[in-house]
Amino acid sequence: MTVKITPNDRGNPPGKLADAELHFTEGPLEGLKLIGFSIWEQRRGGGGGRNVTFPARQYNVNGERRSFALLRPIVDTSAQDGVRELILAAYAEAEAAAAA
């Protein structure tokens, strides 16, 4: 699996750094991609960290906007954490390559 990073050069919405896609290179998902990941500047704590949002579908219930995660852990969140770290590492590589 590879991660494709598309930088957010327009700066809109504020705080969004890039979009990410997972491209599957082997196994039953070979030739497919999973889109909808975004990398954001972390707003809380002022630590300058980064956050990854996962693909989700938004919908309304009684006028309230809600979100339904499309990629979910089966049992615990460690698998989700691994994908998050993979995307952040790919973004760091893309950022370093752009600065070089």
Give the role of each language-model region:
Residues 1-100:
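Single-stranded nucleic acid-binding surfaces, predominantly the OB-fold ssDNA-binding core
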